[in-house]
């Protein structure tokens, strides 16, 4: 601090104006005296300045003689009359002593106010500045207009921005301050938010780990309980052990229903991972569902045990000439857990192979390796999506049911037009030839009754994988000759029906096309008639005008 005083000893320090003026020899002597009297090392704090009475009087004399315009914090000029040499005489002898550390803005002397630069003396009672426009005396900053009139901060800013005086209606006694948020507070809030998010994430990770540990503990406890239940073999423990299985089944059923909904909405029938499921129920109830709802595509799931296999008797006559049998048809369907995608209707006639007839006198069962398709689910009229399934993928024994012949006859008697897709019909015709050739090569003709459901809607139903076995009594088997079985007649009848349906479809499409063409011709003829009439009217008008001119 002493070094600062010695280096700045030859300058009058003005912190406000950043002006360093050289001192006289008297001022240097007075400064040396003050240092000798115990003020060595003292320095005015920040915002203050050291001012002596002699310096103030000398500066005032110089400024009054030069007539310079002096401005203070209030930004206004002071006249030379206000600055006089009498101010030095008015000061009390107390101020002529050592350097006093005074505030930066004012020096109070006997009821008067003097600013730090000694630029102006203003009385608190008489010379209070007043705004010329709004007549206010409270403002944080005084301004002046282009003529030198004193204005408050608000009026001065309004005049500077708008170029006209501020209206008095905008005058307010309350000075409003700007609400500015500091950057430090904003950064602090951001840091707090980040810390909170990190803490929440850490807590979530801890909760996940704890839940995983709990799940592992629960699974281990469940395993122990299951083992104890198996050892004890009580009914109560058996009930408890069935709960997780039912929950897993419900979850898998919900997942399968969602995937089926997606398949039906998108029209995509080539999902190999889609496994149809149904809850366990009686065969009669399921048969009634199939009879009432022919588009029911789900296949009933059964176990492979022989005790659960049952025969369902139903009357089914595809045609009086093609089905002379009076025996009841029983359906045995056994679906494995890994049943692949369901084949299309075109696989109905081309997959008849590898049949076996049991001669034990009680029943005759024919198993189809490739599966026989029955139509159930509807497809879009404009799309002919066929699902080609490999014969090896289809299980040997597939359980399904036959639809009611009453529904078939009702749908055939319906006057609504039949609109099949041409590509699928061609596929069926090709597979029909294959089926006939396969039947001819076999020594004993099988008792297959492939079922073709012709619907009135513009669709071809998707096939459920199935194998149909005909249970015939021993008396009927003994009195019947297999050589007289109408398997060949069945193929011929199917081919004739397919040809007829195809011709009907072609004729109806041709009729629709001709109707559209006739409608177009009619419109064109009407347009030509209108043009002819307009031309005739114009001709008549021109003839009349020429006749009037000639007459």
UniProtKB/Swiss-Prot annotation:
Chain intervals with Polar residues compositional bias: 228-239, 388-400
Entry keyword set: DNA-binding, Metal-binding, Nucleus, Transcription, Transcription regulation, Zinc, Zinc-finger
Biased composition (Basic and acidic residues): 244-254, 478-490
Location of the protein in the cell: Nucleus
Zn finger (GATA-type) start-end: 131-155
Record-linked CDD domains: ZnF_GATA
Residue span of region Disordered: 17-43, 212-260, 379-400, 467-490
Family matches, as InterPro entries: Transcription_factor_GATA, Znf_GATA, Znf_NHR/GATA
Compositionally skewed regions (Low complexity) per UniProt: 467-477
A Pfam family the protein falls into: GATA
Signal sequence range: none
Cellular-component GO terms for this entry: nucleus
GO biological process, one term: negative regulation of transcription by RNA polymerase II
Gene Ontology MF: a single term: zinc ion binding
Domain of life: Eukaryota
SMART domains in the cross-refs: ZnF_GATA (SM00401)
More about this protein: Present with 319 molecules/cell in log phase SD medium.
This protein's name: Protein GZF3
Species assigned in the record: Saccharomyces cerevisiae (strain ATCC 204508 / S288c) (Baker's yeast)
